Swiss-Prot record:
<feature type="transmembrane region" description="Helical">
    <location>
        <begin position="138"/>
        <end position="158"/>
    </location>
</feature>
<feature type="transmembrane region" description="Helical">
    <location>
        <begin position="115"/>
        <end position="135"/>
    </location>
</feature>
<dbReference type="InterPro" id="IPR009627">
    <property type="entry name" value="UPF0259"/>
</dbReference>
<comment type="similarity">
    <text>Belongs to the UPF0259 family.</text>
</comment>
<dbReference type="Pfam" id="PF06790">
    <property type="entry name" value="UPF0259"/>
</dbReference>
<keyword id="KW-0997">Cell inner membrane</keyword>
<keyword id="KW-0812">Transmembrane</keyword>
<feature type="transmembrane region" description="Helical">
    <location>
        <begin position="218"/>
        <end position="238"/>
    </location>
</feature>
<feature type="transmembrane region" description="Helical">
    <location>
        <begin position="21"/>
        <end position="41"/>
    </location>
</feature>
<keyword id="KW-1003">Cell membrane</keyword>
<keyword id="KW-0472">Membrane</keyword>
<feature type="transmembrane region" description="Helical">
    <location>
        <begin position="87"/>
        <end position="107"/>
    </location>
</feature>
<dbReference type="GO" id="GO:0005886">
    <property type="term" value="C:plasma membrane"/>
</dbReference>
<protein>
    <recommendedName>
        <fullName>UPF0259 membrane protein ESA_01554</fullName>
    </recommendedName>
</protein>
<feature type="transmembrane region" description="Helical">
    <location>
        <begin position="194"/>
        <end position="214"/>
    </location>
</feature>
<keyword id="KW-1133">Transmembrane helix</keyword>
Length: 247
């Protein structure tokens, strides 16, 4: 059977519209959890003020120079803030991916499931999913940091890994390996969706200052919810595409 991107986009849109309320609640809940974790673990205002002390900011031409020119105390605060942001974001993403994938599976099986139940039912999957997201995020960011293009290619070929882990009960490295093979063979169907997702998230970052004007906490939840909705759309597309490819 010939698979066209247009038909998969249509199926994705139909599913998203039919399950909009549940998907929105999952996206909002995960964004709220990420914000709360980030707020709990991020250094307080007095500690963050240490980062602006000295000439490290003005005398540094690159990120590496900036870190090298910092005092040990400043480096410790920066590390703590970065770790808090990374962990809270990854934890929220893990809940989102797990909840959305369980929702898709349940609806495909003819079952009605709430946002909380979808996230709760994904609990057995979350530890492996967290490690998978950590590894793929690390590889993609390193690729983007080096030359950009390798990072984008990695984002494309690894995009099916969470779907394979949930649907086939695959292990972490097996899911990554199989995703690379399958996505590479179906690049014309996978790449446009992932690239659109990356561009949409980049565009969302441009509006981040406007969201922050609402108050940092509310802005973070609004921006996080919108970002999560974009990710949910991509997951629905990839899940539908994977099921069609398997047929």
């Amino acid at each position: 059977m010939s698979i066209t991107a247009k038909s998969v986009y249509r199926d994705t849109g139909n599913f998203f519209r039919n399950q909009l309320v549940t998907i929105l609640l999952i996206a909002l809940l995960c964004a709220f959890i990420s914000m709360m974790l980030g707020h709990a673990f991020t250094p307080n205002a007095d500690q963050l003020a240490i980062l602006s002390e000295g000439d490290a900011m003005t005398n540094s031409a690159s990120l590496f120079e900036l870190v090298q020119n910092m005092t040990p105390e400043q480096q410790q605060v920066l590390l703590k803030a970065s770790a808090a942001s990374t962990f809270s974001g990854m934890f929220g993403n893990t809940l989102l991916v797990g909840g959305v994938l369980v929702l898709i599976q349940a609806v495909s099986a003819g079952q009605n499931v709430s946002a909380l139940r979808a996230i709760g039912a994904s609990a057995p999957l979350l530890p492996r999913l967290f490690i998978l997201i950590f590894l793929t995020t690390f590889l993609v960011q390193m690729g983007i940091l080096l030359v950009v293009v390798p990072g984008v290619i990695l984002a494309i070929v690894l995009s099916l890994a969470p779907v394979m882990m949930a649907q086939d009960k695959a292990g972490i490295f097996r899911a990554m390996r199989n995703s690379m093979r399958l996505a590479w063979r179906n690049m014309r169907l996978v790449a446009p969706a992932v690239l659109l997702w990356l561009l949409a998230r980049a565009a969302l970052l441009l509006f981040a200052p406007a969201f922050a004007a609402l108050t940092p906490q509310i802005g973070a939840v609004v921006a996080g919810t919108l970002s999560n909705l974009l990710t949910a759309l991509l997951l629905i597309y990839l899940f539908r595409l994977y099921m069609l490819i398997r047929e």
